[in-house]
Amino acid sequence: MSANGAVWGRVRSRLRAFPERLAVCGAEAAAYGRCVQASTAPGGRLSKDFCAREFEALRSCFAAAAKKTLEGGC
Amino acid sequence: MLRPAGLWRLCRLSWAARVPAENLGRRDVTSGVSPRGSTSPRTLNIFDRDLKRKQKNWAAQQPEPTKFDYLKEEVGSRIADRVYDIPRNFPLALDLGCGRGYIAQYLNKETIGKFFQADIAENALKNSLETEIPTVSVLADEEFLPFRENTFDLVVSSLSLHWVNDLPRALEQIHYILKPDGVFIGAMFGGDTLYELRCSLQLAETEREGGFSPHISPFTAVNDLGHLLGRAGFNTLTVDTDEIQVNYPGMFELMEDLQGMGESNCSWNRKALLHRDTMLAAAAVYREMYRNEDGSVPATYQIYYMIGWKYHESQARPAERGSATVSFGELGKINNLMPQGNKSQ
């Protein structure tokens, strides 16, 4: 960590905003979670990008929520 | 750093010869780092003890230290209950990996005469909680205890043994420093702890990155615990398990609390980076797979409590083979047998 911890502090504050942005994207998160959970059923195999579509939807919703809060405040 | 390292190795080799205390104290300078060419072939080096000390120091000097104490307070009070269950007083006791002294605050002067608090993090010892028992703070690593044989009547350890590298050796040392008829009461995290977090991270990392690396440290299984205690020389073992479930708003809050408790990962094979995408995916999976009705997510902490005694002639021993006077077949007539005072063990 640097002397005044500026970078660490900045990264941490960005991370602290994650939960509220995730709360905004509840539906997309649930869809992604269901897709991953389905792969854990007997006979399913989880491979890379198995649920890529759902994750893209979640990520774009998350980015939109981030932009909204950025424009909204701080 | 050559001279202290050489002295330290000398101290380790003459362990059996009871090296005087002032030389043993020097161990702390190089403690936490296992020598590469170690004397014992079974020495494991899973955790970076130096990093664990830094993490605990950081956790102990946070602005609100009590915010993350809830789990350790709870387990500390349950260990104090077990100490009270034993109808004895302990003139000299040791708390290994005490943190801020969560057990001492629940015990009283009559039960414990003098309490030694040992931890690897000096900030934790500096901010220790109030207790009426006279205490001595010692900066010591759980694997390299600077105490003589047959010193303590009671050794307690709450939620710190899951970070030691060589658990068999740590238990053997605890057995060594106990007096005959002394008791060791410990609590450590068990196999199912944080399984929700482990599974979520595993699934998310596999889906996002194609493979996964361990983020939760490996825990001891309950069978192994019994064997380890037996191998260390303890008698009359008792191991029982308890599950504490804590609800969090989400995965990020859980991880923040774990860091605040000083329980961040410090294994050598940890991945240095956890991608934001993976964290996001894991939080989504955690919420979907494990959430409660009210929207919170649970985290399970499985605690194993163990009690072991150091051998003394006065302790009860199993009866001799063939000395039974009553057979199990007569169990139905136990009412007739009992007034005679003729109970078989």
Swiss-Prot record, chain B:
Compartments (UniProt record): Mitochondrion inner membrane
EC nos: 1.-.-.-, 2.1.1.-
GO terms of molecular function: monooxygenase activity; S-adenosylmethionine-dependent methyltransferase activity
Alphabetized UniProt keyword annotations: Membrane, Methyltransferase, Mitochondrion, Mitochondrion inner membrane, Oxidoreductase, Transferase, Transit peptide
Protein name (record): Arginine-hydroxylase NDUFAF5, mitochondrial
Transit peptide limits: 1-36
Functional summary from the UniProt entry: Arginine hydroxylase that mediates hydroxylation of 'Arg-111' of NDUFS7 and is involved in the assembly of mitochondrial NADH:ubiquinone oxidoreductase complex (complex I, MT-ND1) at early stages. May also have methyltransferase activity.
Gene, per the UniProt record: NDUFAF5
Highest taxon of source: Eukaryota
Pfam families documented for this protein: Methyltransf_11
Quaternary structure, from the entry: Interacts with NDUFAF8, leading to stabilize NDUFAF5. Interacts with NDUFS7. Interacts with PYURF (via TRM112 domain); the interaction is direct and stabilizes NDUFAF5 protein.
Membership in a protein family: Belongs to the methyltransferase superfamily.
GO biological process terms on file: methylation; mitochondrial respiratory chain complex I assembly
A GO CC annotation given for this chain: mitochondrion
Lineage, broadest ranks: Eukaryota, Metazoa, Chordata, Craniata, Vertebrata
Matching Gene3D superfamilies: Vaccinia Virus protein VP39 (3.40.50.150)
